[in-house]
């Protein structure tokens, strides 16, 4: 939404659960797992590696998207994240994001 309250566009990203489910359903050996935040970015086993990739990877993706959006807009953007699982990844983002 711009300074004149007009909707100018946005982006839709795959959710955490969709990403995690896709890994297990579209590969032969990766298990279906719960979406718990790993303690470290570098996983030591398959489950922690999957969780790290999804959770920390999505946080980095969001930060990167915001940088690109602000570059395109020529200034700062206010971001509101939606979805029930957003609270799992937002604390790991380096950018400030509102959760509605």
Predicted stretch roles:
Residues 19-100:
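ATP-binding/phosphotransfer module of carbohydrate and carboxylate kinases, centering on a glycine-rich
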Residues 14-16:
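A short acidic/small-residue loop/turn micro-motif
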Residues 7-12, 96-100:
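Short hydrophobic/aromatic-enriched beta-strand-loop microsegments
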């Amino acid at each position: 939404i711009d300074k004149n309250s007009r909707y100018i566009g946005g982006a839709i990203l795959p959710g955490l659960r969709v990403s995690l489910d896709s890994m297990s359903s579209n590969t032969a050996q990766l298990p279906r797992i719960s979406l718990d935040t790993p303690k470290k970015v570098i996983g030591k086993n398959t489950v922690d590696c999957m969780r790290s990739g999804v959770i920390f990877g999505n946080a980095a993706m969001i930060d990167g998207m915001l940088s690109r959006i602000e570059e395109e807009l020529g200034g700062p953007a206010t971001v509101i994240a939606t979805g029930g699982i957003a609270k799992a990844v937002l604390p790991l983002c380096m950018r400030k994001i509102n959760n509605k």
